[in-house]
């Protein structure tokens, strides 16, 4: 959200009017988007809606993600590994969401996941998404995450 040329980084509660009909073979998820780039967040929000999922919130930082998670149930978080700022990076955020709220994470990055080494394993991700990505890539990553979550 922008006003007067500045980005508003308050958490957004998106639990109403954001769910479309999910397919019978794919349960709808309540997804928390943790991304500090507004355009990427908005793209993911649109893709998730198109795929029949609900966006439970959008957070640009670890602290905001924890605040949203404390007040709004989420089944999954899509977390940018390169998250900057308030409280830690995306791996720290994924670990905190899992440990404090039981929310698994699908991690996304523009870097190679191999470059991130063992640290990424501490987040115990249910999937990965490499930037840049398409709607189809997001759908594939979500389907993989759903398969792990229901297994």
Regions found by a protein language model. Give the residues of each.
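Active-site residues of response regulator receiver
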Residues: 80-82
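Short amphipathic alpha-helix used as the core "switch/output" element in two-component signaling
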Residues: 89-103
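Hydrophobic/aromatic residues positioned on beta-strands within the core alpha/beta folds
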Residues: 108-109
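As written
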Residues: 119-129
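Acidic, metal-coordinating helix/loop segments flanking the phosphotransfer/catalytic sites
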Residues: 45, 58-76
């Amino acid at each position: 959200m922008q006003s007067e040329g500045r980005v508003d980084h308050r958490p957004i509660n998106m639990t109403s009017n954001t769910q479309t009909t999910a397919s019978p073979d794919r349960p709808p998820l309540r997804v928390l988007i943790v991304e500090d780039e507004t355009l990427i967040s908005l793209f993911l929000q649109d893709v998730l809606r198109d795929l029949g999922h609900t966006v439970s919130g959008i957070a640009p930082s670890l602290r905001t993600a924890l605040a949203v998670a404390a007040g709004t149930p989420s089944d999954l978080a899509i977390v940018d590994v390169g998250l900057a700022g308030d409280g830690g990076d995306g791996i720290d955020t994924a670990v905190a969401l899992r440990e404090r709220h039981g929310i698994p994470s699908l991690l996304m990055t523009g870097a190679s996941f191999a470059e991130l080494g063992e640290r990424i394993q501490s987040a115990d991700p249910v999937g990965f998404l490499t930037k840049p990505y398409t709607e189809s890539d997001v759908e594939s990553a979500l389907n993989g995450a759903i398969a792990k979550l229901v297994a």
